[in-house]
Amino acid sequence: MSLRALTLIRDAYPDALSEQYTDRTGGAWGVLKAESLRPVLAHVKDDPQLDFKLFLSMDGVDRLQLTDNLPRFEVVYFLYSVTWKEHLRLKVRVAEENPEIPSATSIFQGANWWERFVWDFYGIRFTGHPDLRRILMYEEFKGHPLRKDYPLRQRQPLIPERPIRDIFRGPGTSGTA
């Protein structure tokens, strides 16, 4: 992974990284402060020495059962530089009291649906997101099912099935050959 990239980020933004470490596979991780997220993401995308233009994915982590006094949630970003053939993994820690961080959609359009997924399943809000609504669960769904404190046997309200528009065959076609 990219210790080189983390060094370049630290040089450009000395206060942005609160922590950096290498995991047991040799992968480099950087922990960003939430207020530094957007400037650092823009920098790693646009700086030719970094060139992390490929947004691979992002995810949420609920750390509820860990006892290390760190914030409950994390949002993890996975980026790749085709130029340098390097992966970059950045994460932002998010407090339970106000689970909210800036949106990355204006920097990486690919973050749009990933942020909706993290909102839908973990309840972490992304300020500045153009359309932050549920992506997989229906709108009436109560709670966020990947949180560790979500009750497994909770019953959800039943709603009538909604019609789905067939965008391939168009109106008035039966779909049979």
Language-model-detected regions and their locations in the chain:
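Terminal low-complexity/charged segments
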Residues: 1-177
